[in-house]
Amino acid sequence: MSKRDYYEVLGVSRDTSEREIKKAYKRLAMKFHPDRNPGDKTAEANFKEIKEAYEILTDADKKAAYDQFGHAGVDPNRGGGGYGGGQGDFGDIFGDVFGDIFGGGRRGGQRQAARGSDLRYNLELSLEEAVKGLTKELRIPTLATCDLCEGSGAKKGTSATTCGTCHGQGQVQMRQGFFAVQQPCPTCHGRGKIIKDPCTKCHGDGRVEKSKTLSVKIPAGVDTGDRIRLAGEGEAGEFGAPAGDLYVQVSVREHAIFVRDGNNLYCEVPISFSKAALGGEIEVPTLDGKVSLKIPAETQTGRMFRLRGKGVKSVRSHAVGDLLCKVVMETPVNLNDRQKELLREFEATLTGESKKHSPKAEGFFDGVKKFFQDLNS
């Protein structure tokens, strides 16, 4: 009877991640585990099939061979004698030979337990939080060391035993014609040990899915794109190997008033026509509260004022940026009759004196006049 496709056995697609494969395995292993189905031969057969599929699809070398050659690529009985072992074995042999030559293959000896994967957490902050700094409580979904077996993967009271196929070496020698090469042991996958009685909680993986809460200090001055590394706070490693790291990726939300550029802040401040013409003091918002800003008489709209030290403290030095305020003159609206009359009277006083009171406007209209004269000449 031909074997079922390993991906079909676990109910996953060929592009599924290793983490999803592990989740599918754990779900099915719990369903068909012999301890839960005593005396059920069908469940026992299903469990063995699931375990075999899992062992192949979570081993990078075996998975690659299976994806290319199917079951023939991972059948240890097809490795003996001559070139009659089939295309799958021939390809695997040359893959290992050239992998060793160019540094891609494993050296002899047991496979080292893999370091835990790094994790990334996207943290969104307000501008105020980013500028002042704070401590955040982050809830991180991860793989943690199984507390029942303490990461060994073996059932409580038992331990891993020496592999009978490779006798603890983690490697087996295979011959193909004139070639003799070492490959990871297909039984223990290079570990040199096998777990006969897997832990009932982690099912032999040594790790379980878990969420943990971390208190993370965010330094003052961080900005979008900054990354904070927390060593050892990633996923737990395999069978006691070091854990990965956690990287907190910072992004800062847009602010209703301020725009940040490096350590400087920018904002627009509206002023009245009379304030721009006569001058005076206005209140300007900063991240530390309101401050007074003196507006000189005859200030034009768009003029920039710099408030030194009112920007952002650099996260990498003691430098502090500035706050740059651009004043924008507002045209008055909803005028009553008296206000309109006063503006007409004011406008009348400017007749014949536009160069004196509006030099930029007069210069602009002189330029327009000259442009049309040159055009018609």
UniProtKB/Swiss-Prot annotation:
Sorted alphabetically, which Gene3D superfamilies does this protein's record hold? DnaJ domain, Heat shock protein DnaJ, cysteine-rich domain, Urease metallochaperone UreE, N-terminal domain
* J domain: residues covered: 5-70
Q: Where are the zinc fingers (CR-type)?
A: 133-211
Q: Does the keyword Cytoplasm apply?
A: yes
Q: Where mainly found?
A: cytoplasm
Q: Where in the cell is it found?
A: Cytoplasm
Q: Cite the repeat ranges for CXXCXGXG motif.
A: 146-153, 163-170, 185-192, 199-206
Residues given in the record as Zn(2+) 1 binding sites: 146, 149, 199, 202
Q: Name one GO molecular function term.
A: heat shock protein binding
Q: Which UniProt keywords apply?
A: Chaperone, Cytoplasm, DNA replication, Metal-binding, Repeat, Stress response, Zinc, Zinc-finger
The alphabetized list of GO BP terms reads:
chaperone cofactor-dependent protein refolding; DNA replication; protein refolding; response to heat
Cofactor dependence: Zn(2+)
Any GO CC annotation of this UniProt entry: cytoplasm
Which residues are noted in the entry as Zn(2+) 2-binding? 163, 166, 185, 188
The annotation note on the cofactor reads: Binds 2 Zn(2+) ions per monomer.
Q: Which InterPro entries match?
A: DnaJ, DnaJ_C, DnaJ_domain, DnaJ_domain_CS, HSP40/DnaJ_pept-bd, HSP_DnaJ_Cys-rich_dom, HSP_DnaJ_Cys-rich_dom_sf, J_dom_sf
Q: What does this protein do?
A: Participates actively in the response to hyperosmotic and heat shock by preventing the aggregation of stress-denatured proteins and by disaggregating proteins, also in an autonomous, DnaK-independent fashion. Unfolded proteins bind initially to DnaJ; upon interaction with the DnaJ-bound protein, DnaK hydrolyzes its bound ATP, resulting in the formation of a stable complex. GrpE releases ADP from DnaK; ATP binding to DnaK triggers the release of the substrate protein, thus completing the reaction cycle.
Report the sequence similarity comment from the record.
Answer: Belongs to the DnaJ family.
HAMAP family reported in the protein's UniProt record: DnaJ
Q: Cite the domain annotation text.
A: The J domain is necessary and sufficient to stimulate DnaK ATPase activity. Zinc center 1 plays an important role in the autonomous, DnaK-independent chaperone activity of DnaJ. Zinc center 2 is essential for interaction with DnaK and for DnaJ activity.
- PANTHER family this protein is in? CHAPERONE PROTEIN DNAJ (PTHR43096:SF48), DNAJ HOMOLOG 1, MITOCHONDRIAL-RELATED (PTHR43096)
NCBIfam families reported for this sequence = DnaJ_bact (TIGR02349), PRK10767.1 (NF008035)
The protein's assembly and partners: Homodimer.
Protein known as:
Chaperone protein DnaJ
- Species assigned in the record: Shewanella baltica (strain OS155 / ATCC BAA-1091)
